[in-house]
Amino acid sequence: METTEGKNDLRAKLAEKIQTFRSQRKATEKVDRALLLQRRKEKAKARAEAKKLAKKESKAKQESKVAAYDTGNSSDNIADEENDNHKSTITYGTLIVGDDKFSNGKLKVAGKKRGPTDVFGALKHLEAKKRRIESMDEEKRRKIEESDKWHRVLLQAEGKKLKDNEQLLKKSIRRKEKEKKKSSDAWKERKDNEKKAMLMRQQRREENLKKRRESKKSKKGKAPKKKKPSKKK
C-alpha cells in the first residue's frame, strides 16, 4: 500500500505539471497578442506613410500648376495633364490603399471596386496595364510603381491574396486548362461508355426477340398431325 508521504509526492508532482502547463499556455497567449498588436502597428504605420505620400503628391501637383500658370501656359498644361490622367486612369493626388482612398491627403472610404475575379480576367487586366504603363514617360511610370508598391504592402499586411504576378497567373491558367481538359476527357469517356452500354442492351434485346421467334417456329413444326377419320364399309 502507498504511504501518505508517497501520495503527497504524487500530488505535488501533478500540481507542478499543471502549473507548468498553465504557464506555457499564458506565454503562448502573450505571444499571440503581441503578434496581433505588432501587425496592427505595422498596418497603421503603412497607412500613415501612404497618407503622407498622398499629401506630397498633392502638394507637388499644386506647385506644378502654379509654375505652369506663371509661365503663361497654365491652360494648355493643365488641360494636357488632365487628358493624360484620364487616359492612364491615374490621379496623382489620389492613392488607393486597400479598401481606403487618400485624396489630397484626406482619407475617404472607397466603395467596392469591381475588377476581374478570375485568373483569365486578371491576366488580361495585368497585360493591358503593363502595355499602358510602358507607353508612359518615366515620371508617370515611377509614380504608378510607387503607388502600386504601397498597395501591395497594405494588401499583404491585411492577408489578402495578390493577383499581380504574371508568371503565377499563367501557371494558374495552365493548371485550370489541364483540369478542364481532364474533366472534358472524363465526360467524353462517360458518354462513350453510356453509348456502348445502350448498344449492348439493344443487341441483347434483339437477340432475345430472335430466340423467341425461333422458339415459336420450332414448336409449330413439332405439333402432332391430326388423324383422318376412317371410312365405314
Swiss-Prot record:
Which InterPro entries does the entry mention?
Rrp14/SURF6_C (IPR029190), SURF6 (IPR007019)
Task: Please list the GO terms describing molecular function.
Answer: DNA binding; RNA binding
> Where in the cell does this protein reside?
Nucleus, Nucleolus
- Keyword presence, NADP: no
Query: Highest taxon of the source?
Result: Eukaryota
Q: Where is the composition biased (Basic and acidic residues)?
A: 47-64, 133-149, 180-209
Q: List the disulfide bonds.
A: none
User: Pfam family of this protein, just one?
Assistant: SURF6
Q: Name one GO biological process term.
A: ribosomal large subunit biogenesis
Q: What is its main location?
A: nucleus
Annotated coiled-coil positions are 32-65, 122-223
Residue span of region Disordered: 47-87, 130-149, 164-233
Q: Where is the composition biased (Basic residues)?
A: 210-233
Q: Which positions carry the signal peptide feature in this UniProt record?
A: none
What is a single cellular component term in the Gene Ontology annotation? nucleolus
Modified positions (Phosphoserine) are: S75
Entry's family note: Belongs to the SURF6 family.
The entry's function note states:
Involved in ribosome biogenesis and cell polarity. Required for the synthesis of both 40S and 60S ribosomal subunits and may also play some direct role in correct positioning of the mitotic spindle during mitosis.
PANTHER family according to UniProt: SURFEIT LOCUS PROTEIN 6 (PTHR14369:SF0)
- What is this protein's name? Ribosomal RNA-processing protein 14-C
Organism from which the protein derives: Schizosaccharomyces pombe (strain 972 / ATCC 24843)
